[in-house]
Each structure stands twice: as C-alpha cells, then as structure tokens.
Amino acid sequence: MTTLAPVRSAKTVQLTTYKRDGSPVATPVSIAFDGGDRAFFRTYDQAWKARRLRRNPQVQVAPSTLLGKVTGPAIPARAILLEGEQARLAARALARRHRLLQAVLVPLAHRVRHYRTLHYELRPR
C-alpha cells in the first residue's frame, strides 16, 4: 500500500479515471486533507468523471497545476463516495483549504444548476 504523501502539499491534483474501454481521462481537481491522511475532492453527479467513478473507482492522482500540468509522480488510489457526516467533513476540509473556490463558488454553481454535489475520499492502493 502506498501513501498520499507526495500530493499532500498540492492544492490541485490531476485525477485520472478510466473509460469502459480502459483508456485514461485526466482532470485537475482541488484536493484537501482532514488533518490526517484522508484526502478529499468533490464533483457533481452529472460530471463524466462521476459516471466513470461509478463504474471503476480505481484512479491515479498526481500533483499538478490548476490547469492540469503534472508536477510530480502519480499514485494509484481508489475513490470512495462519501455520504452523510463523512461528506460534510469533506466539504468542510475543502472549504478550509480553498476558501473562495470550494467554500463559495463551487457550491453556488452546483445549487444554481441544480446539481447534486458528490464528495469522494482518495485512499491509496
């Protein structure tokens, strides 16, 4: 089992999910830790990455710039969908780490567009 230590200092990671045919799709996402070794990200229910994660939760994460340029090694991980209190914990961690983006703008955009926000935990494989 690996650790998520290489992405701990990154605010954004490149999340690589996989299509049905196995081809990779990379997307930059904001990431936050809860103070321990738990990493979180969020998306909305109609996003293609959410659909791919429902089929295959195996992912690769690598530290990156906001635009998705990889700045470090990729780590194999598993994305676990969170619900209830765990999802609220993830939302708070993201809001603390990314004050404007994840505390205001993303939740507002999801509400305006009537999306359901999904919170995921990244666990190293």
Task: Enumerate the language-model features and the residues they cover.
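Short, structured beta-strand-loop surface elements
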Residues: 46-119
